[in-house]
Amino acid sequence: MLPSDHPMHRLADSDYLRACRGKGHERVPVWFQRQAGRSLPEYHAIRGAGSILKTLRDPEVSAEITLQPVRRYGVDAAILYSDIVVPAECIGFGVDVVPGVGPVIEQPFRTTSDLERLRPLDPESDTAHVLKTVEILVDELTIPLIGFAGAPFTLASYLIEGRPSRDYANTKSLMLNDPGLWHQLMDRLTDLAVASIRSQVMAGASAVQLFDSWAG
């Protein structure tokens, strides 16, 4: 149950949230995938060089980057500036996002012993900076904020491959040759995603999305 002062209540009649619920709306609401980020000159001015994960640890900067496309384009929803590997990085799995490459894993997931490296997420301590970013945003926004997490298959593909891949050979091999371990990994990553998006909603996000880039 959401608290009575949750932003979703005051924004319930926005075109975006009405569309999310399958209700009628005055016009088609619009937001853009990756609207916060590389396409905006003001993003590059504030972002600087280095890993995105360093930027994401600063709630004020992350909130500002989230707000930039809202000011520029007048979109109907803001999407949190973050990355799907953040929860895994925050529980100590050894993840970085290398400019020009993408997520790179220090020690890729390979065996049953690697499950021990995927402990449960405690959002209040592990991703406190993410929740602070959400809180800053909902105080400023007059439109819904979308939170998100990586869906289990896509996050697993990064953790197993160790970096972006063209054929996901290691992922397919694990699925086919050790289905028991694969399902245990899916369970751990499902719990990780649920804990992450639930905490974002409780912090003030009005909608959430799972990104599953490699499932298709």
Predicted regions and their residues:
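Active-site loop segments of alpha/beta catalytic cores
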Residues: 128-216
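Glycine-rich tight-turn/loop motif centered on a GG-T
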Residues: 49-55, 94-105, 113-124, 160-186, ...
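Glycine-rich, aromatic-flanked loop segments that form ligand/cofactor-binding clefts
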Residues: 19-35, 75-105, 124-167
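Membrane-interfacial amphipathic helices and adjacent loop/beta segments
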Residues: 109
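Glycine-rich anion/phosphate-binding loops
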Residues: 51-75, 120-138, 180-195
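Short, intrinsically disordered/low-complexity patches at protein termini
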Residues: 65, 103, 206-207
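N-terminal basic, low-complexity leaders that serve as flexible interaction/assembly modules and, when applicable
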Residues: 1-95, 99
